[in-house]
Amino acid sequence: MSTSADDEQYTGLILLSGVDKPGIAASLFEVLSPFSITIVDIEQVVVKDRLILTVLIALNPAHESAIAADLESCAVSLDVDIATLFSYEEKSALSTKSNLIHVLISAKKLTPKALSQMAASISQNGANIERVTRLASNPLTIIEFVLSGATKETLTQSLSPIAISNSAEITVQ
């Protein structure tokens, strides 16, 4: 099935990683500001002073090489790594997902085994993990999974026994 140009948007996915320090986001957006682009999505996480920043932009395809060159210079000046992926996307794929489910997992000691079992159960129920965030670490570790593609009831039924067997608690919202 082909799509018309009206159904597609040219995008650039920017993935920046490196040691976190003040001013990285400001510098990145300063480099992008001369171009006629729109920020479609953005996520940032810092774990143990390591930064991962992803930005999805909508742009004119004619600007791709100039943006890529400016981002390479930015990476050198900031001493970070920047990878890019430019492609056409269906506009419908860029819209915000609805009906997301939030699963909170809390435990005094959260193990890889527990997360492996929960992630497998989530997948087996047809859900996709959209985002994972640590909300707290002391005295309990609390992790939030944001999921798409399943029902609250199904997830509650499948995750509850796993949580109990791993001395954890879950809340599905």
Residue ranges and their predicted role:
Residues 2-173:
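A conserved regulatory-domain signal marking ACT and ACT-like small-molecule sensing domains
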